[in-house]
Curated annotation (Swiss-Prot):
NCBIfam families: heptose_epim, PRK11150.1. The lineage of its organism: Bacteria, Pseudomonadati, Pseudomonadota, Gammaproteobacteria, Enterobacterales. Contains a large N-terminal NADP-binding domain, and a smaller C-terminal substrate-binding domain. It is an enzyme of class 5 (isomerase). Belongs to the NAD(P)-dependent epimerase/dehydratase family. HldD subfamily. One of its GO terms (biological process) is lipopolysaccharide core region biosynthetic process. Substrate binds at residues 169, 180, 187, 201-204, 209, 272. Its EC number is 5.1.3.20. This is ADP-L-glycero-D-manno-heptose-6-epimerase. Catalyzes the interconversion between ADP-D-glycero-beta-D-manno-heptose and ADP-L-glycero-beta-D-manno-heptose via an epimerization at carbon 6 of the heptose.
Amino acid sequence: MIIVTGGAGFIGSNIVKALNDKGITDILVVDNLKDGTKFVNLVDLNIADYMDKEDFLIQIMSGEELGDIEAIFHEGACSSTTEWDGKYMMDNNYQYSKELLHYCLEREIPFLYASSAATYGGRTSDFIESREYEKPLNVYGYSKFLFDEYVRQILPEANSQIVGFRYFNVYGPREGHKGSMASVAFHLNTQLNNGESPKLFEGSENFKRDFVYVGDVAAVNLWFLESGKSGIFNLGTGRAESFQAVADATLAYHKKGSIEYIPFPDKLKGRYQAFTQADLTNLRNAGYDKPFKTVAEGVTEYMAWLNRDA
């Protein structure tokens, strides 16, 4: 059995889909479906069982055996970069992850988890998986950074696989439940379909991020499970592209619309990453050599998925 925490969420459900595509259906999804809309991410997927996150955590903390576990993909977390409740964030992202890590270590179960490029904070170069480059800007980034630091202490002694992925700007199918935290491509598509002008912040041609397609993210997760490699790795494309490029690809797909530029909000000044670009040296050195979709390729595929019933 493979366990996917956050399996009804964005990246988790895409990992479930990638496992299904390989013929794997003996999957336990762990999630919190208080937001009932997330169920839509699972309706076309095949899983063996579902468990609520709180019930799962109780079983983990009590040391209860959950059966023959082949691996745990730990994608369950609070991923809101605008959430400032530090206790909630540390409980959800740090303590929960530690409990799960030790459960896996004691049983030598491969543990593959979601870290984040938010660990790098506001830097504009050298996104390298090393302490001197890490300075998160928000409590979300700090919770991810602290767990990475915890993992670094354990890795040299670990007898089983531990691998963390620093996700950059992930976009693609099954993110509709994320609301304001969904990708720019998702929001632009929604605005166009509602007959509105798609909106970008002024200066969006200068705001560049490493936008990585979720299908590529899932593929990297599965490759690492098969390879058995451990470590903390950036997971982006290695190419920074502008928000304008995302908009251009969206408009090209729809063949209509023009961008409306809106003022940059004061509340985001100083807390907004203007540039991100994954350094893929460690990922490539680990042996992952497949190409990543460009924004034009990924957004076009995503638009086709979003508008498949149109």
